[in-house]
Amino acid sequence: EFHLVAEPVERELADGMIAHLWGYNGQSTGPTIEAVEGDRVRIYVTNKLPEHTTVHWHGLILPSGMDGVGGLSHPGIPPGKTYVYEFDLIKSGTFMYHPHADEMVQMAMGMMGMFVVHPKDPAFMRVDRDFLIMLNAYDIDPGTYVPRIMTMADFNLWTWNSRIFPDIDPLVVNRGDKVRVRVGNLTMTNHPIHMHGYHFKVTCTDGGWVPESAQWPEVSIDIPVGAMRAYEFTADHLG
């Protein structure tokens, strides 16, 4: 069981820069939900926002009534109320969650998070280090604290896990580690990812794990809007 509380939050995007956002459980991006393939999960969502909301489980295969699309498969969660989502995790992989209610406001304010479903077999696609990066973008005027809403492409702050360079957390590994990096993109534009000094293999997409025979080597990869990619490499260089 998990409990998400949709609420206003404060987030330090960079040293000394505080933004007034919306998120989950006091943070934006929201907490990462982790479970195992085959689990049945029950997720309580409490709405402490000034308007109705939903949670859409982006990429997960589940019943329509649990998909969290406001006005289509879900009436929305009114302010002050709690809704319970419950569904089975039928495949492993990397997924995301976000509202499908007043998206141009709620997602622009930072409401999103990652959802990782680990394989039932712990030996399948095993790595030594496993990192998550959520790409998000904001439009915040200098000297202000609240993002502009209803913005399609005029973002001025690009964040990794809601942190701005150079205050992004480093990926710390040991030499020789097999490393996986999972990247989800909930901005409004495609985003290329490049690893300086390394090549890697793309091992997972939105559709699932890529068989070893189909994995391809890369030094840069484009992450489409609303998509996820995972890549792996061996950390055989110091620095």
Predicted regions, residues:
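Copper-binding active sites and cupredoxin-like electron-transfer domains
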Residues: 1-239
